[in-house]
Amino acid sequence: MPDVSSPRDVPRDDLQADPPAVDLTTTVVVVLGTPAATRTEDHRALADLVARLTGVTAASVSLSQVCPNCAQPGHGPLRVQLAGAPDGSPTAHVSLARAGGRLALAVTAAGPVGIDLESVAALARAPLADVLLSAAEADAVAALHPRAATAAVTAIWTAKEAVLKAAGVGLRVDPRDLTIAWETPGAPGSDAAHPRLAGWPNAPFLLNELHLMRVATPPEFAATVAVVCARRPRLRLLPNPA
């Protein structure tokens, strides 16, 4: 089971604190905080986090986005460039999500990463089931009581968004092509259940190399992080209480 800190609302000032030493090749680091006024400032906060986790200067870290579909800059997967990094240095992978006045950042060198953060109330108001659920998921959700069904749909949505971000394709892929199952007995989306990618016919990676981890959040939010790598990484939520 991943090492997840207790849910807490992390003030933006905490993003400036020096994080403890962590092996990014075996760990995915997640920070929850408050978004800045602009997307550019949020990207700078993510770049600063990469700098502190990798031990380089902030000036040596830059982020870029180029859409793999239209080849235009300014949108698409976030990529990290480390100026002057030694040959053979692990590649840092990053992801970012915003929802309901909150921000989630993810950094790892284990492999491509995607994170999704959602407002539970906002998703509950949206008619998602018809555009989100595979046939197997729809059957599982239909068997649940309404409150449990809402939690399940929220968990499935954040898991699929995280997977599609890690794959670098986003919502250009129909979410219904993916099927999320649950490793632990319990209702989908419950605290006792852990998601896994059970099906995606055109996945750009082996399904057993996609690792999903639910992130501890305040109760009004839900978050999931996905990492593509051979071995399941450890999840570290910062700031991490001593």
List the predicted regions and their residue ranges.
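Core catalytic alpha/beta fold that binds nucleotide/phospho-ligands
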Residues: 1-242
